[in-house]
Regions:
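Alpha-helical transmembrane-bundle signature of multi-pass membrane transport and export proteins
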Residues: 1-419
Length: 419
């Protein structure tokens, strides 16, 4: 089949466009919230509460979200959560326009975090119903690529709109929130056009046993457990993005404009990788490809840690984004293909919990190590940042070796297209 055969699937194409529109709006909202909170409070702690306000509902709602995704129409869950996201976004619009107290912003973010927690497992588990198994890996590649594209376009569009609106409007963030609300409504309209439906064979009662079925399945399936563990620890140890402001100002001397480019470099690399993957045959040794991609991620992270040249640093982060995209495609494909449909929602919820918390904790870990080996020990802050990034890259490589030895099934896994 051709590289773009999956796009001839009407339902998948509608799903893909809806995902891009929704992701674009969410990326814009994330930037706008950070900008408005800092403008109003000038507090780094206020920015820290943004992640916390979305992480708390994710941890609290993960198990119920997985159970709901396995026992109710996944399409309807996506539609309902899109409406909730739209309402929360319009709530932020009002709060920003009237300059309401900051805690109201956090309340809306808690609602958004809860809606996303229910949306993710339903959306992930719904995708296998839209395409045949032979095209699923390509579908995941396109889905990942559109998300990364929104990660590049969203902040850029948001920044440009805020810069323009700031000259003529006292509440530019309100416009961004309204646009995200419209994007969520557009996603609702697009998903409602999808003809295929997830049919629940038999609803399972809400119980501790059924809620924990996703965790039990993950820990019983060695390949899924190994892939989730690999990605979780790699993100926890190898993430350099939280320290990019230090690199841009103290090490590379590139300032705010350079910081913007550095933040865009990983999504750019991921999009480029997605384009390459769509034009080549499916991975023949998916397990080995994932292990090697994470190992290269660690090596590129180490090299970035030592780099003092801006464009070399940009290129190394782009490499990180590219190989991370390979890992994401393989992991997501394995999780969905190896999980029975009646458990896909709960397993997807567990997957999102591990990855989501590792993203948040990874930033905290990087900052803690940088502070410990920087100012706490009397060294420049740049020294602490370099030690944090390089040690994280080394830790990532050690994780790859450990996973390959503990779960040899991953090394032996072949094609993702079911052939």
């Amino acid at each position: 089949m051709g590289s773009y055969a999956v796009l001839r699937n009407r339902d998948f194409l509608v799903y893909l466009i809806g995902r891009f529109v929704a992701s674009l709006g969410q990326q814009m909202l994330s930037v706008a919230v950070d900008w408005e909170l800092y403008e109003r409070t000038h507090s780094a702690l206020a920015l820290g509460f943004v992640g916390l306000s979305q992480m708390i509902p994710m941890v609290a709602c993960t198990l119920p979200a997985g159970h709901v995704a396995d026992n109710f129409s996944r399409k309807r869950i996506i539609l309902m959560m899109s409406l909730v996201l739209a309402l929360a976004s319009f709530g932020l619009t009002f709060i920003s326009a009237v300059n309401a107290p900051v805690p109201w912003i956090y309340l809306c973010l808690v609602v958004i975090g809860a809606a996303r927690t229910f949306l993710w497992p339903a959306s992930s588990a719904f995708l296998p119903h839209l395409v045949p198994r032979s095209l699923f890996a390509r579908a995941v590649t396109f889905s990942s690529g559109t998300f990364q594209l929104s990660s590049v376009a969203g902040p850029a569009v948001c920044g440009a709109l805020i810069a323009i609106m700031s000259r003529h409007h006292s509440h530019p963030a309100a416009l961004i929130y309204a646009l995200n609300g419209i994007a969520s409504l557009a996603c609702f309209g697009l998903v409602s056009l999808i003809r295929r439906e997830h049919i629940v064979a038999a609803k399972q009662p809400l119980s501790v046993t059924n809620l924990g079925a996703g965790f039990r399945f993950v820990f019983e399936n060695k390949i899924i457990l190994g892939t989730i563990t690999l990605d979780m620890l790699a993100v926890l140890l190898g993430g350099a993005t939280s320290l990019l402001p230090i690199y841009a100002k103290e090490i590379l001397g590139s300032g705010a404009s350079g910081l913007g480019l550095l933040r865009a470099s990983m999504p750019i690399g991921a999009v480029a990788c997605a384009l390459v993957l769509t034009h080549r045959r499916p991975l023949q040794k998916a397990g080995r490809a994932m292990l090697w991609s994470v190992a290269v991620f660690g090596l590129a992270t180490i090299a970035f840690g030592f780099s003092k040249w801006f464009w070399l640093s940009f290129a190394l982060l782009a490499v990180c984004g590219a190989v991370d995209n390979i890992s994401v495609v393989v992991r997501h494909s394995l999780v969905q293909l190896l999980t029975p449909d009646e458990k896909r929602g709960r397993v997807s919820a567990v997957n999102s919990l591990f990855i989501g918390t590792s993203n948040e904790l990874g930033g905290a870990e990087s900052g803690f190590v940088a502070q410990l080996f920087g100012r706490t020990m009397g060294n420049p802050v740049s020294t602490g940042a370099v030690i944090s990034v390089v040690s994280g890259g080394i830790g990532t490589i050690l994780v790859v070796i450990a996973v390959a030895l503990i779960w040899p099934q991953i090394r032996k896994y072949g094609r993702l297209d079911g052939a």
